[in-house]
């Protein structure tokens, strides 16, 4: 069943608000219309393109500063950070991240994105991974965008430990999940 333009545009606004990193191609598939129709709808609704939306989210939310490592040491691009709370990063899977014979992302890149996000979310000068329990749930291919979301689930400053849960998504599908037991200094 086709939706009316007004209904589609209302759903488009809601979808982009809840999932700001969704591409025009993904939106076109979701709504069963052409990419051009999505672009025209966005233009009519004054919704910026994906790159601009990512930049806007980053500017609005990155007022906290990563303490435990420098931003160039983070794998992926951090777009949201609340120290000792939660964080989000994006990794565009490119040719250098995949096996040449099948264009599937090497697992260590997905782990590195999640692990560096788990380190970055810690509100401490020193944060190291003590242990990790991880699971890869599906292959990630070249050209896909991996959005990693980290959430601090337990902080025991007197023991110098923090637990961070990280789930990585392509679209709405979980492709990686991990629980990271992080060591932090006891002085913070």
UniProtKB/Swiss-Prot annotation:
**Gene3D superfamilies registered for this protein in UniProt:** Hotdog Thioesterase (3.10.129.10), Winged helix-like DNA-binding domain superfamily/Winged helix DNA-binding domain (1.10.10.10)
Listed name of the protein: Transcription factor FapR
**Out of the domains of life, which is the source?**
Bacteria
What is a biological process (GO) this protein takes part in? Answer: negative regulation of fatty acid biosynthetic process
Record InterPro entries: HotDog_dom_sf (IPR029069), Thioestr_dom (IPR006683), Transcription_factor_FapR (IPR017275), WH-like_DNA-bd_sf (IPR036388)
Q: Which SUPFAM superfamilies match?
A: Thioesterase/thiol ester dehydrase-isomerase
Keywords for the protein's UniProt record, in alphabetical order? DNA-binding, Fatty acid biosynthesis, Fatty acid metabolism, Lipid biosynthesis, Lipid metabolism, Repressor, Transcription, Transcription regulation
Named from the GO MF annotations, one term is: DNA-binding transcription factor activity
Instruction: Give the similarity note.
Output: Belongs to the FapR family.
**Function comment:** Transcriptional factor involved in regulation of membrane lipid biosynthesis by repressing genes involved in fatty acid and phospholipid metabolism.
- Source organism of this protein record: Bacillus velezensis (strain DSM 23117 / BGSC 10A6 / LMG 26770 / FZB42)
């Amino acid at each position: 069943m086709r939706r009316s333009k007004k209904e589609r545009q209302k759903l488009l606004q809601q979808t982009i608000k809840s999932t700001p990193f969704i591409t025009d191609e993904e939106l076109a598939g979701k709504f069963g219309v052409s990419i051009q129709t999505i672009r025209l709808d966005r233009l009519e609704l004054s919704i910026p393109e994906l790159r601009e939306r990512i930049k806007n989210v980053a500017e609005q939310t990155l007022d906290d500063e990563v303490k435990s490592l420098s931003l160039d040491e983070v794998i992926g691009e951090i777009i949201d950070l609340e120290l000792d709370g939660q964080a989000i990063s994006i990794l565009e899977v490119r040719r250098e991240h995949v096996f040449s014979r099948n264009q599937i992302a090497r697992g260590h890149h997905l782990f590195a994105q999640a692990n560096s996000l788990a380190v970055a979310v810690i509100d401490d000068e020193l944060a190291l991974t003590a242990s990790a329990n991880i699971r890869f749930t599906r292959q990630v291919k070249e050209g896909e965008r991996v959005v990693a979301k980290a959430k601090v689930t337990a902080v025991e400053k007197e023991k110098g430990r923090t637990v961070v849960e990280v789930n990585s998504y392509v679209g709405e599908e979980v492709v990686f999940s991990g629980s990271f037991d992080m060591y932090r200094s006891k002085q913070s």
